[in-house]
């Protein structure tokens, strides 16, 4: 893949500060996963800004006998309840039976003396991950038909996932679906309160609106909690065929529209103001509009989507708070990365967008 075209390569050599003792890992995994008696080669997946993901290749890397993926939390202190490798392992050790697009997890290790953090090992799925730029496999953004398929597959696969019976997946006791959205809203309002650095009447008004207009949740389903196109892999020969869904560490049970709102918050229409990050290439010719995507989810899932604006606004509000949290760390001198110096403006833009989307 071409980095100059804005496309991140899939695999890189392990970053210097994210290396681990490969011999120790090889010794630990020997006889614990099939094929682990062969020589081990480790590379790192370039995508992802939180949990660290590595490719474990056993045998000749050109014709590997076995490939696995190792996942661990990011370096440094981790907030309680976040980057939960045990949770992700639990989900992936059983979900694949009911939802084959979830990779199968084989092993979990919470002995931090092995790697320095909990980790788990799962199967590798091969496919194309589409981030902010459409890769050349799918026409580089110029193929409207391929773009349409990409926009459809991310919606259709979400509806398929929400149709999974939690009990049949062995996850009927996951999370606490009762009062899920109320807890979510109060949690994010609290994060905003801790990250704000000056009065903001627009966000105050938006917060009241979110509290006063929260709709009644439909029946609970399994939730991914970070459903986006760049958390999926698609068949390189068919952009309309998903081969894997990634990043399950926040999976729980709750309101299915929370997933839709997260997805739609990242779904920018062509006439909307651009911000520094467009996590999905939804402005590309041929992509469904956000409204078309919402209606398609309603048809595919059989759910009434007439209250989806609330979830769209809340999803956009969450994006804004995330940027504000990063900005306040820069403002307080907790990070010196100058890329974060403008995130306060970007957060303000997203708060304005959230307010506008109340009537979208």
Identify the function of each model-found stretch.
Residues 222-224, 229:
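Catalytic-loop of the protein kinase fold
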